[in-house]
Structure formats: C-alpha cells, structure tokens
C-alpha cells in the first residue's frame, strides 16, 4: 500500500470529525418534541430550525472551502470543530425561537465546513486503489454519530434536555486530536499575486476553466442522493406503522437496524468502488436502494419488513462515502476541498425539500406512492452519473 505515512492518523482524525456532523443533525431531531413545548412554537417554526441549519451548511461550504484552500485543510477542520462546539454549547444560554434560528444557522456554517476538507485530506494521503474504502469508512461515522445521539438522548433527555446539545462540545477537544494526527498543509498563499506560495483560490474557482458543467452536474448528483435519502429515511418508519401495521414498540429498534445496514453499506460500496470504479459502484448503490425501497411497496409481512431495513440502509448510504473519493478526484487538487464541500452541501437542498414533498404526495396519493417517487429519484441519479467522467476505473485484483 502506498500513500503517505500519515494515512492512518488522517483516517481516524477525519472519522471522528465527521461523526459530529450527524450528531448535530440527529440531536436537533431528537430534541424537537421538547423544543416545541419549551419555545412554544408550531411545527412549521420547528421545521425552520432544521432549514436554518441546512442553509448555514450551504454557506459554510463556501466559507470553509475557501479557508481550507487558502489557509490549510487542517486549519479549516480545527476551526469548524471549535465553531461547532461553541454553537452546541450556546444552546444552554438561549431561550427564544429567534435566538435558536440564528444559532442554528451559525452552527450549520460549521457543519458545512467539515465534509470537503475531510474528503480532500483522504485524497491527499490515500492512494487511488484504496481511496474509495478509506473515504467510505470516514463518512460511515455518519451512522455512528446518529447512534451516539440516540443513546445520549435516552440518557439525558428526561433529565436536562440541553445536555443533549452540550455533549456536542466534545468537538472542541476533538479539534486537538486533529492537530495531533493531521500533518500541516503544504504552504498555501493568502496573497492575490501568488508570490508567497500558491495563488489565492477565489469564490469562482469551481466554475472556471471548464469546471462549471462538472460542478453543476456533481451538485445535482448530491441533490438527488440527499433527496432520495431523506425522502425514504424520513417516511419509511411512518409508512411501516400506518400502512403495514408494525407497532410502535416494534419500530423502537428500527433506526438501529437501518443504521447497522448503513454502516455496512458504506464499507461494501467503498471497497466496490476500488474494485470496479467509482461511477459503477455508485450506480450499483442507487439501483440497490431503489430496489430495496420497492420491496416495501409490494411486500406486507411485518417481521420481514422490519429486518429488511438492514438492506434499505445498506443501499441508502452506499454512494455517500464513494462521493467523498469521487469529488476529490473529479476536481483539481488546489480546489478539491472547496469543490467537494460545495457540491455535497448544496445538495442539502434535496434534503430540505424531500421530506415535505414526499409527505405531500403521501397525503394526496398515499405514502406507498411517495416512496415509489424516491425509487424514481434514485434511478434518475444513476442516469445522471453517466453524464460525469469516471475518475478511477478500479483494480479488480485489489
């Protein structure tokens, strides 16, 4: 195995870093019933807190992407972790919906600064033939973070709900881990003329030199990927209880079943991308989840549908890790943290719109039809990938 001597420390540092991305998003969802009562807000107002986080992440992908390229990717990750920890801890000192809205936007900025630098660091330190599995392992911490959030919620939510957020301040000492494990970046210029190292990367860099089409299509792939994920993952539990008759008691453990499948799916499709190529692996993941969700539409056996959640989870996140390697290879080295983070986080538009859209379709035509739409979304995503170039064709001997 080639790559740099820092490849393993970087792997673990980025794995831990990305865990806080999913932890933050999950604790907001877990605490939402309490927030509705404490802040005396409506369901739409509660939903706006999630939307503010998504908007912040989109802005953060630009801000932290430029920081990563001009001041260093390690520095960007450290700053994002400290920023995130401050945002999580500040929850203890606010008590109005307006303050929450502003805080969630600001915290979202930090969230948007994590994905791109993580993907770029893996690309820098891991060779192409192992890069898919390395990136997928890093981003599989999404599933771990969600499980940790669920466990912390069970422990503290009935005691002091703010502790659920305050626990996220662990991201601040985690920044020290990044400083310890990730090597300093090569010299990056902060001057416009490029006399002190590399030229400054500007906000339009991902649209210059013929990159506009690539950036646009890659962003669309992220929109489809995240729309499919949140459309399916958000509504499948409700579908199984309302239209397939699974009890709430049975569904209590369903999220853990899905997260187990997600973690395994990350690893499988990461290895597959190193074996047969990035695009083929992601297309396989999209087709897998489309077929798996379709099974929910036609099968009615409750116990089977419960455990089928492993297969659905397996496909849901299969492409997410591979995209980390793919986007880093798709763009030039000097902008890969910015470009990858931009394409991924702008895709959160799909995450924001899908739950409402699928819910509306479900209200009018039934959730069975709504889930069928997510299958179509994934098939469209598979077709869309064919419009982008392959970056690594795979090594079947690996």
Predicted segments — roles?
Residues 103-140:
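Cytoplasmic helix-loop-helix junction between adjacent transmembrane helices
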Residues 29, 211-266:
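Extracytoplasmic gate region of multi-pass secondary transporters
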Residues 40, 72, 93-99, 127, ...:
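Helix-breaking motifs and short loop linkers at transmembrane-helix boundaries and internal kinks
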Residues 59-95, 276:
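Conserved MFS/SLC helix-loop-helix module at the cytosolic interface between two early adjacent transmembrane helices
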Residues 138-180:
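Helix-loop-helix hairpin linking two adjacent transmembrane segments in secondary transporters
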Residues 170-188, 382-389:
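C-terminal membrane-cytosol helix-exit motif in multi-pass small-molecule transporters
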Residues 131-154, 344-354:
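Glycine-rich segments within core transmembrane alpha-helices of 12-TM secondary carriers
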Residues 35-36, 67-68, 152-158, 240-241, ...:
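Interfacial helix-cap and linker-helix signal at transmembrane-aqueous boundaries
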């Amino acid at each position: 195995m080639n790559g740099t001597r820092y490849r393993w420390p970087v792997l673990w540092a980025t794995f831990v870093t990305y865990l806080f991305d999913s932890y933050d998003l999950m604790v907001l969802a877990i605490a939402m019933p309490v927030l509705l009562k404490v802040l005396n807000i409506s369901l739409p107002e509660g939903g706006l807190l999630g939307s503010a986080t998504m908007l912040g992440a989109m802005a953060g992908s630009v801000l932290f992407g430029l920081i990563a390229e001009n001041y260093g990717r390690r520095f960007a990750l450290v700053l994002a972790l400290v920023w995130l920890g401050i945002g999580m801890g500040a929850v203890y000192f606010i008590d109005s919906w307006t303050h929450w809205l502003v805080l969630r936007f600001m915290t979202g900025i930090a969230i948007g600064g994590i994905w791109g630098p993580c993907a770029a660091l893996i690309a820098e330190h891991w060779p192409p033939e192992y890069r898919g599995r390395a990136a997928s392992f890093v981003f599989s911490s999404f599933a771990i973070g969600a499980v940790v959030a669920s466990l912390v919620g069970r422990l503290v939510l009935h005691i002091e709900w703010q502790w659920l957020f305050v626990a996220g301040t662990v991201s601040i000492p985690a920044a020290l881990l990044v400083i310890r494990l990730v090597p300093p970046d090569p010299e990056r210029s902060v001057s416009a003329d490029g006399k002190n190292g590399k030229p400054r990367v500007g906000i339009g860099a991902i649209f210059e030199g013929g990159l506009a089409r690539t950036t646009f299509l890659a962003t669309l792939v992220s929109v489809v990927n995240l729309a499919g994920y949140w459309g399916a993952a958000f509504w499948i539990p409700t579908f199984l209880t309302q239209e397939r008759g699974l009890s709430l008691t049975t569904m209590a453990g369903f999220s853990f079943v899905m997260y187990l499948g997600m973690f395994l799916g990350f690893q499988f499709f990461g290895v597959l991308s190193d074996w047969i190529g990035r695009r083929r692996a992601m297309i396989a993941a999209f087709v897998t989840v489309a077929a798996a969700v379709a099974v929910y539409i036609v099968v009615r056996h409750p116990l089977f549908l419960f455990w089928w959640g492993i297969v659905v989870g397996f496909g849901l996140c299969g492409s997410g890790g591979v995209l980390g390697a793919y986007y880093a290879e798709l763009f030039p080295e000097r902008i890969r943290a910015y470009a990858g983070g931009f394409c991924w986080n702008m895709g959160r538009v799909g995450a924001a719109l899908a739950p409402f859209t699928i819910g509306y379709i479900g209200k009018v035509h039934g959730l069975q039809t709504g889930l069928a739409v997510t299958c179509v979304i994934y098939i469209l995503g598979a077709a869309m990938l064919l419009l982008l170039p392959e970056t690594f064709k795979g090594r079947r001997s690996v």
